[in-house]
A protein has these predicted regions:
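N-terminal transmembrane-helix/juxtamembrane module of multi-pass inner/ER membrane proteins
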Residues: 47-51
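Coiled-coil dimerization/phosphotransfer module
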Residues: 57-60
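Hydrophobic alpha-helical transmembrane segments
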Residues: 1-35, 53, 64-65, 70-207
């Protein structure tokens, strides 16, 4: 999805569309292709943790179809930051489809890592429980997602980007464990989104 959406945005940029606008269109198209799963998870997590309370109350808020002030604020800021980070990376000379493809790959990789590290909450749906899959498949997927990054970014950029991703993913996981007793699908979606931003930030800081 990142490659497709990023490819569209790259074409628009090559047609002299402003970089920030091309990136915004690419990100919007990526959200459409993915069904906004990660964005929904981030908004739900912000609503639940922002409102507070015991695990059941937070879970009810997370699974509520309504979007609250915390969710709107977090999602709006996150999308703005994502557009700014991606457009800034494009201005350094990187191709848009490379940036978006690698960012989504890293985010999904940390989703799998957190799914391994943390227990599943009693409030999680069946999709979260069945997400794990076999060990071999998970290892192959992680290699396919992470190895291309070695040929795109410098080792220093990767080290800082992955370090920031680790901090963010652990924060999401331990916060979910403290409030919900474990992770849920929404927490994993938020983890993917936030680690993607952390990865972009790490790459940009050493660009």
């Amino acid at each position: 999805m990142g490659l497709i959406a990023g490819g569209l945005g790259q074409i628009l940029i090559l047609m002299d569309l402003p970089i920030i606008l091309g990136c915004a269109i690419a990100i919007a198209f990526c959200i459409y292709l993915s069904g906004a799963y990660h964005e929904d998870g981030l908004a739900d997590m912000a609503d639940g943790f922002g409102a507070g309370g015991d695990g059941r109350r937070i879970s009810n808020i997370i699974h509520d179809s309504r979007l609250g002030t915390y969710g709107v604020s977090a999602l709006s800021l996150a999308i703005i930051v994502r557009i700014l980070l991606v457009s800034s990376l494009v201005e350094t000379g990187l191709w848009l489809f490379v940036i978006m493809g690698s960012g989504l790959a890293v985010g999904k990789g940390f989703v799998m890592i957190n799914r391994r590290l943390f227990e599943v909450s009693e409030f999680a749906g069946t999709a979260t429980v069945s997400f794990l899959g076999s060990n071999i498949r998970q290892i192959v997927c992680l290699l396919l997602w992470f190895l291309p990054c070695l040929f795109i970014f410098s080792l220093e950029q990767l080290a800082l980007g992955i370090f920031l991703c680790v901090l963010v993913s652990l924060w999401c996981g331990f916060r979910a464990k403290f409030y919900l007793g474990g992770i849920t699908g929404d927490i994993l979606g938020a983890t993917a989104f936030l680690t993607e931003l952390a990865f972009f930030l790490g790459i940009l800081l050493l660009a």
